[in-house]
């Protein structure tokens, strides 16, 4: 007798439907009003390797390096409170105004140059590229003074939220190990702040937590965290606020090959080599590492000092500056020259030359000029748009003075007669709390452009470039006066007509 039985294969149910993320072009209307905004000359001066501190542990000279991220937090004026030439082109009862970034140009001053770094006590044992036939044994301290140049990086990222970086940090192992065991690794995501170190060629990692000897890398990163932009995470952001677009150029080659001194934590398996005799009985250090180099610096491969136009962003946010702010992240190691300064310890220079009569200093300078082109846009506030914006970021509606109305209170309220009496509690109303900045705990280079907007695009270099590429013409300011016709009659008398008698 045949019997029916269900199939043994698994049944897959369809996924639960989720709300769809739409592009800002579907609910943001563009206008024909454009503005130029530019910063003043932005300068930074400091020590390229570390912050110089005084006796009270207060920083007297900050750390300013060409290998640092420069994260500019650009503040924009509120377009709903902006003095517009025509205030009737939108309805404030049903619409709100926002800025859209159309163009950006990062101006870089200072000449091209290569900055070097190093360590006076670097963990360098042997030259493994051109090493001796018989490697010498390790001593108690084999550290040497070594300097190098770093990987070459040019980077520019634009978004309305801070960029996200990644690095490898020290993780928590499942079991407690013994002293000297290799630490567990964990991929860490964090916000890239102004002053964070870039990847120099030694990896994106927390050197302070993963290198206890403080001698495996140069002194400017041996106690720092080198971060690398997490392009995968920012590209997969559903709203695309952290990364409208980015420009990147990286290059590196290996200059020298060394190995590390110390006890080898991982032994070479016996099946990978044939044991030797004599001086080759004991293997040399097999922890090899290179010294990176960024190679030649040339003006032919520069990403800066030229305009870039945003026609279509890579995410759903097509350049809309939510929160009236823009985050511009810049890295440029092609201008990382470290200037050497010398000061005499004596009032007059004496002869013969004596090294102790002079003090040597290092300083690095950074120079920026930021220019933007912004377009004024309108958002029509219907039920669907407001619900979508609230699910995306509720603070946007709060900044637009939209909020939930509190329910009516039915409880009995207490009212005192003598409000200034010392016998009762203080009746002064509590001051309203200021809106907290969710990014106050991070460090950014603040650039305020609230009073630097101008509609005269032809008065600025980037504005003229925008008018040229957009096929627009500036309004003429000088016009030739029109000649008016003379109201006086001609001086010559009219001829009388002859009449027959």
UniProtKB/Swiss-Prot annotation:
Disordered: region residues: 473-501
Organism superkingdom: Viruses
Record GO biological process: endocytosis involved in viral entry into host cell; virion attachment to host cell
Keyword flag Methyltransferase: no
Record keywords, A-Z: Capsid protein, Disulfide bond, Host nucleus, Host-virus interaction, Late protein, T=7 icosahedral capsid protein, Viral attachment to host cell, Viral penetration into host cytoplasm, Virion, Virus endocytosis by host, Virus entry into host cell
Annotated family: Belongs to the papillomaviridae L1 protein family.
Chain's role: Forms an icosahedral capsid with a T=7 symmetry and a 50 nm diameter. The capsid is composed of 72 pentamers linked to each other by disulfide bonds and associated with L2 proteins. Binds to heparan sulfate proteoglycans on cell surface of basal layer keratinocytes to provide initial virion attachment. This binding mediates a conformational change in the virus capsid that facilitates efficient infection. The virion enters the host cell via endocytosis. During virus trafficking, L1 protein dissociates from the viral DNA and the genomic DNA is released to the host nucleus.
Protein name: Major capsid protein L1
Organism: Macaca mulata papillomavirus 1
């Amino acid at each position: 007798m045949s019997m029916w039985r269900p199939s043994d294969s698994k049944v897959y149910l369809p996924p639960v439907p989720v709300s769809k993320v739409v592009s800002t072009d579907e609910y943001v209307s563009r206008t024909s009003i454009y503005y130029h905004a530019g910063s003043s000359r932005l300068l930074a001066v400091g020590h390229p390797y570390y912050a110089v501190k005084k006796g009270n542990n207060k920083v007297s000279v900050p750390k300013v390096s060409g290998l640092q991220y420069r994260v500019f937090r650009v503040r924009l004026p509120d377009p709903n409170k902006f003095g517009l030439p025509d205030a009737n082109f939108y309805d404030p009862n049903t619409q709100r105004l926002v800025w859209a970034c159309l163009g950006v140009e990062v101006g870089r001053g200072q000449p091209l140059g290569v900055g070097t770094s190093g360590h006076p006590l670097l963990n360098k044992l042997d030259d493994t590229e051109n090493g001796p036939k018989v490697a010498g044994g390790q001593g108690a301290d084999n550290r040497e003074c070594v300097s190098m140049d770093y990987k070459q990086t040019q980077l520019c990222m634009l978004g309305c939220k801070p960029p996200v970086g990644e690095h490898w940090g020290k993780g928590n192992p499942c079991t407690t190990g013994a002293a000297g065991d290799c630490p567990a690794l964990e991929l860490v995501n964090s916000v890239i702040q102004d002053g964070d170190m870039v990847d120099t060629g030694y990896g994106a990692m927390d050197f302070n937590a993963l290198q206890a000897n403080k001698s495996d890398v140069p002194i400017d990163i041996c106690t720092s965290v080198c971060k690398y932009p997490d392009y995968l995470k920012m590209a997969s952001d559903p709203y695309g606020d952290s990364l409208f677009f980015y420009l990147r150029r990286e290059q590196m080659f290996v200059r020298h090959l060394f190995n590390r001194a110390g006890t080898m934590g991982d032994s070479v398996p016996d099946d990978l080599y044939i044991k030797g005799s004599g001086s080759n009985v004991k293997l040399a250090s097999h922890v090899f590492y290179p010294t990176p180099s960024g190679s030649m610096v040339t003006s032919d491969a520069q990403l800066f000092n030229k305009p870039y136009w945003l026609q279509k962003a890579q995410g759903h946010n097509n350049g809309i500056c939510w929160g009236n702010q823009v985050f511009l992240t810049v890295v440029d190691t092609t201008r990382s020259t470290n200037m050497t300064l010398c000061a005499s310890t004596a009032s007059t220079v004496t002869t013969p030359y004596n090294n102790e009569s002079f003090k040597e200093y290092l300083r690095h300078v950074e120079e920026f000029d930021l220019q933007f082109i912004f377009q004024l846009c309108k958002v029509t506030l219907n039920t669907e748009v407001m619900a979508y914006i609230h699910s995306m970021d509720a603070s946007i509606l709060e900044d637009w003075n939209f909020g939930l109305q509190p329910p009516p209170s039915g409880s009995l309220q207490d009212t005192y007669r003598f409000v200034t009496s010392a016998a009762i509690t203080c009746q002064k109303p509590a001051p309203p709390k200021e809106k907290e900045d969710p990014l106050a705990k991070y460090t950014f280079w603040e650039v305020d452009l609230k009073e630097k907007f101008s509609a005269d695009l032809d008065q600025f270099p980037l504005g003229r470039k925008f008018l040229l590429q957009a096929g627009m013409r500036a309004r003429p300011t000088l016009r030739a006066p029109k000649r008016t016709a003379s109201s006086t009659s001609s001086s010559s008398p009219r001829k009388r007509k002859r009449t027959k008698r």
